[in-house]
Every structure is written in C-alpha cells, then in structure tokens.
C-alpha cells in the first residue's frame, strides 16, 4: 500500500500530476481542491495517497491532507460512488463544504455536481451523516489547516487559459456545452487557467 509520496513535482495537468520519487515517476490523480494547493513545478511536494488496484489498471489518488483522504475513503464506501465520482465531488467543493451540505441535507447543491443524481445525493446524505461525525471528531481543529499556511501562488497567465479550463471541466464529467458556457460566463481578461477553473466550478454550484 502506497500511503504517502514525497518528491519532485515534474508535471501538472489538472487533475493529474507526475511526482518523481527517487528516480521513479508516479502518476497521481487529485481533486482540484488539492491540486491548486500544490507548489510550482520542480519543487518538492508531499501528497497522501490512496492506492486502487483494478483488473485493468493500478491507480493512485492524492490529497494534500490526511483528512481529505479520509473523506475520499468514506465516499467510495457509499453505495454507487466509485473513486472517479468521489474525485469529482471533492473537485467541485472543499471537504468542509461537503460536510456542510450533509449537515444541511442540501440535495440541491449536490445534484449540481456531474454524475450525482438525486438518488445518489440522497444516499450520500444518509450514509455519510454518521460516518462524518466520527471523522470530524477524529480530526477536530485540523480540517483544511493547510489552507491557512499554503504557499500557493497563481501560475503565470497563458493564452490557453480558456482551453485548459474547459479541458479540466470535461475531465470531471461535465458536458462540452456546459463547460464552454461556464468558462465563457466567468472569463475576464488576465485570468489564469487555475483561477478560471475555480470560478467556473463555483458558477455551476
């Protein structure tokens, strides 16, 4: 079981990174909420991982904090929620926002996420309520601490910001028309791709 990786961040293309650890390159998929807390390329990064073995692939999912990984692990235990959908959920909202949705029985917000229908949202609310109580008790005071001490700075503005944003939304399961409309609605001159993706996601919730 690979539970933690520490190495050089050599590639970043949302939602995937390539982390070089002692000469080996690990492909890691991350929720966007974690992805944008990473340092710049060619800097050291630490990610907590969840390893999935399937018949046709071996996949690594990465997170900035243990608490976020713990939430991911709870999500994939929910009936009808696999790693891909769990990653989409944590890309569309932070861990604390998801917890708030469960506490408020907020189905309306959950069903706006791609792949989350009404039945899945209802299952999440029912099955996650008790699980989250245990998680919050175990991590009281520590959830999303990294947000307060993050050294993240936006990447330089590039001409393909809109293309990158649309590609990231498509990778999360949004339809081309949805992605294009959301990006166009929030785009402003000077926006970098990371800010544009965040704004686009917020506009759809």
Curated annotation (Swiss-Prot):
Residues 144-156 are annotated as: Flexible linker. Its main location: cytoplasm. The keyword Calcium does not apply. Keywords: Cytoplasm, DNA damage, DNA recombination, DNA repair, DNA-binding. It is found in: Cytoplasm. GO terms for molecular function: ATP binding; four-way junction DNA binding; four-way junction helicase activity. One of its GO terms (cellular component) is Holliday junction helicase complex. InterPro entries: DNA_helicase_Holl-junc_RuvA_I, Hlx-hairpin-Hlx_DNA-bd_motif, NA-bd_OB-fold, RuvA, RuvA_2-like, RuvA_C, RuvA_C_sf. It comes from the Bacteria. Residues 65-143 are annotated as: Domain II. SUPFAM superfamilies: DNA helicase RuvA subunit, C-terminal domain, Nucleic acid-binding proteins, RuvA domain 2-like. Residues 157-205 are annotated as: Domain III. Residues 1-64 are annotated as: Domain I. One of its GO terms (biological process) is DNA repair. The RuvA-RuvB-RuvC complex processes Holliday junction (HJ) DNA during genetic recombination and DNA repair, while the RuvA-RuvB complex plays an important role in the rescue of blocked DNA replication forks via replication fork reversal (RFR). RuvA specifically binds to HJ cruciform DNA, conferring on it an open structure. The RuvB hexamer acts as an ATP-dependent pump, pulling dsDNA into and through the RuvAB complex. HJ branch migration allows RuvC to scan DNA until it finds its consensus sequence, where it cleaves and resolves the cruciform DNA. Has three domains with a flexible linker between the domains II and III and assumes an 'L' shape. Domain III is highly mobile and contacts RuvB. Belongs to the RuvA family. Homotetramer. Forms an RuvA(8)-RuvB(12)-Holliday junction (HJ) complex. HJ DNA is sandwiched between 2 RuvA tetramers; dsDNA enters through RuvA and exits via RuvB. An RuvB hexamer assembles on each DNA strand where it exits the tetramer. Each RuvB hexamer is contacted by two RuvA subunits (via domain III) on 2 adjacent RuvB subunits; this complex drives branch migration. In the full resolvosome a probable DNA-RuvA(4)-RuvB(12)-RuvC(2) complex forms which resolves the HJ. This is Holliday junction branch migration complex subunit RuvA. It comes from Shewanella sediminis (strain HAW-EB3).
